[in-house]
Swiss-Prot record:
Catalyzes the epimerization of the S- and R-forms of NAD(P)HX, a damaged form of NAD(P)H that is a result of enzymatic or heat-dependent hydration. This is a prerequisite for the S-specific NAD(P)H-hydrate dehydratase to allow the repair of both epimers of NAD(P)HX. Disulfide bonds: none annotated. This is NAD(P)H-hydrate epimerase. Its cofactor is K(+). It comes from Anaerococcus prevotii (strain ATCC 9321 / DSM 20548 / JCM 6508 / NCTC 11806 / PC1) (Peptostreptococcus prevotii). The lineage of its organism: Bacteria, Bacillati, Bacillota, Tissierellia, Tissierellales. InterPro entries: YjeF_N_dom (IPR004443), YjeF_N_dom_sf (IPR036652), YJEFN_prot_NAXE-like (IPR032976). It catalyses: (6R)-NADHX = (6S)-NADHX; (6R)-NADPHX = (6S)-NADPHX. Belongs to the NnrE/AIBP family. Keywords: Isomerase, Metal-binding, NAD, NADP, Nucleotide-binding, Potassium. Its EC number is 5.1.99.6. Residues 9-215 form the YjeF N-terminal domain. (6S)-NADPHX binds at N55, N56, G57, A58, D59, G131, T132, G133, L134, N135, R136, T137, D160.
Length: 218
């Protein structure tokens, strides 16, 4: 099995986007559909999707948009500074705002208490807070959010990597989402591979990164 660290994966992504001119929004869409492909939509009909404001969050919003288009019940929780949102995040957020008003930005412990009650009503949580680029201890609202996700003990799917896990070493950056399923995009991430607790829960899905990009970097 091919395994890469976070820096190598970033170089592959950048080569595909900058050199081969694969639109990043296309990769986001393929990532979203890869996650949905692995959900039993007859059993799982209501979702809380928790997103950061970067590209992992963009994947989460694209998942939300597709599920909303299918008529599923979706709540979206945004964790992070929206002034730092990626362009792909913004595009998907603008679309989601036209499909639902259940978009929340928890800012306080009181907001989290409301969120905790809301999470009890959904069948599935999708974790798209942090991707492989996390290199700092998780604190503040993000730490509370991850702790809350774990405390609900709801079936949880992580996009690419469990939020809070180091993409290279598998170490914990404080709180880590205890995922039931991980959909890893294109290539297994070393941090997941090194953590046996997560490795066996991981499915690798092709999201359309050309093999030429992979060969150019590896």
């Amino acid at each position: 099995m091919l395994v890469v660290d976070s820096k190598t994966m970033k170089k592959i992504d950048q080569y595909a986007i900058d050199v081969l001119k694969v639109p990043s929004i296309c990769l986001v869409e393929r990532a979203a559909l890869a996650v949905i492909k692995n959900i039993n939509l007859e059993k799982r009909t209501s979702f809380a999707i928790v997103v950061g404001v970067g590209n992992n969050g963009a994947d989460g919003l694209a998942i939300a948009r597709n599920l909303l288009a299918m008529g599923k019940y979706v709540e979206i929780y945004i964790v992070g500074d929206l002034t730092k949102q990626s362009q792909d995040f913004k595009l998907n957020l603008d679309s989601c705002k036209r499909l639902t008003d259940k978009i929340f930005e928890p800012k306080s412990i009181e907001d989290l208490a409301i969120m905790e009650r809301n999470l009890e009503e959904v069948s599935t949580i999708i974790d798209a807070i942090f991707g492989t680029g996390l290199n700092r201890t998780v604190g503040g609202m993000q730490s509370y959010m991850i702790s809350l996700i774990n405390r609900t003990m709801k079936y949880t799917i992580s996009v690419d990597i469990p939020s809070g896990l180091d993409g290279d070493s598998g170490r914990n950056w404080g709180e880590v989402v205890d995922s039931d399923l991980i959909i890893s995009m294109q290539i297994m991430k070393r941090g997941v591979y090194e953590k046996s607790h997560f490795k066996d829960k991981c499915i690798v899905e092709d999201i359309g990164i050309p093999q030429k990009a992979i060969r150019a970097i590896l």
